[in-house]
Amino acid sequence: MNNRLDNNRTIRAPHGDKISAKSWQTEAAKRMLMNNLDPDVAEHPHALVVYGGIGRAARDWPSYDKIIATLDRLEDDETLLVQSGKPVGVFKTHSNAPRVLIANSNLVPHWANWEHFNELDKKGLMMYGQMTAGSWIYIGSQGIVQGTYETFVAMAKQHFAGSAKGKWVLTGGLGGMGGAQPLAATMAGFCALVVECDETRIDFRIKTGYVDIKANNLEHALQLITNACVKGDALSVGLLGNAADVFSTLVKSGVTPDVVTDQTSAHDPLNGYLPQGWSMEHAAKMREQDPKAVVTAAKQSMAVQVRAMLALQQAGAATTDYGNNIRQMAFDEGVTNAFDFPGFVPAYIRPLFCEGIGPFRWVALSGDPEDIYKTDAKVKELIPDDAHLHNWLDMARKRIQFQGLPARICWVGLKDRARLALAFNNMVKNGELKAPVVIGRDHLDSGSVASPNRETEAMLDGSDAVSDWPLLNALLNTASGATWVSLHHGGGVGMGFSQHAGVVIVADGSDEAKQRIARVLWNDPATGVMRHADAGYDIAKNCAKEQNLDLPMLNEE
């Protein structure tokens, strides 16, 4: 019997101010776990898969049921330990300790590869937590929209004199992460052609407002893109097809996009990438019958796609890796120049990381969108002079549909995270919000990840692979009193290529929450400034001095 699949389950988080757990801290963790599996949020909820190939919220359905039951009975001086999606222990701690500590997908380095992980996964001994799937803070495609938007805005500034009008992006993948690309591109002023091999994903993104239109074929797609570019409109087009096929066809046809990237689930060649010439049904069958053949065929197709991306770069397209490790997969297949195009973090995002700026997010446990709109207004009030941020919030309200519990993503840094969260806590206390707010972030943040092919690619001092930093981040957030803390391996880029930590805290309006928020949401982004200052970035050093961070090795500079 497959205890990971239950087609009869439909999970939705409770809304409102009535709780069944013993406190809002544990009620929040329960609701966020359930929200990760809401059919409006998750990619394959019946199989516990949230996003990113096989990124799960719990190891299996018995584990899920036991986590829910345990959170309902957990006392305010107890901590639940979750090991790769399975609840393994409840221990007496104290009221300011985290209520849940999570470790997902972690393997001793020598064994940290997909082959060994897949053996353990098949035996039911592990699960892949991705980043926010197994740490219960996924908010649907909105969670990555602003980061993608910031990247596209930076590309327009660097390559097109600040204007994306009449320019278009070619990319692949419309899963939980890739699905953000078309909306982010059009928000930034680009047109976007997104290739996806699963038609249900195109339809889902159209339904949720992330894709504007579905093309019948490549010729139709290019006609739609060309017409929109000529008019100066920003249009997103979903095209059913194989990314390796379509990218290669464009090269042969001499059609050069302005921007090229990719967000297929290339990080997981077994479960995340469809080989050329294969149907979805054939791939599903082969995963059971001959997984090694699937991996081989998928990586060969990735090599074809990356060669096409390199050719488009040579033809003049601004080309970047969007963090799915496709360059590494192609390199392993003999594409020796796969890394000739850069990753998006060193190319466009790192200056933000140097100031601790990253994907801050919050969720209204009331389930009422008005609570999010009120917090949007509070952000504008507290950060009055940031026109770019205000523009983002305005666009988000108009164009982003909530998935599951209403949520907002907003890239802010060390200067602002704690004071925004404290304001939200005060709004809960005063009754301005109908229920508490959950505050967290992606693991893709300035101080919480080591990923040499993504977030820590091309660090100034060569410390790309040093993973002490996310471990220190998780330890500090635990000591600071976060509500739940997670430590994962392999998110984004796959097994053996990343380690990363997550943090979530609940603003329940209490004075105790106020104290915890002040510690956690200062210390967490401060570790990002620390990490980049230690690597020698002047922006980070200046930020550390301005914010009076105590960094012993830098204090005398």
UniProtKB/Swiss-Prot annotation:
One Pfam family named in its UniProt record: Urocanase
Compartments in which it is found: Cytoplasm
Active-site feature positions: C410
PROSITE patterns: UROCANASE (PS01233)
Key words, A-Z: Cytoplasm, Histidine metabolism, Lyase, NAD
Function: Catalyzes the conversion of urocanate to 4-imidazolone-5-propionate.
Protein name (Swiss-Prot/TrEMBL): Urocanate hydratase
Natural source organism: Pseudoalteromonas translucida (strain TAC 125)
Classification lineage: Bacteria, Pseudomonadati, Pseudomonadota, Gammaproteobacteria, Alteromonadales
Gene: hutU
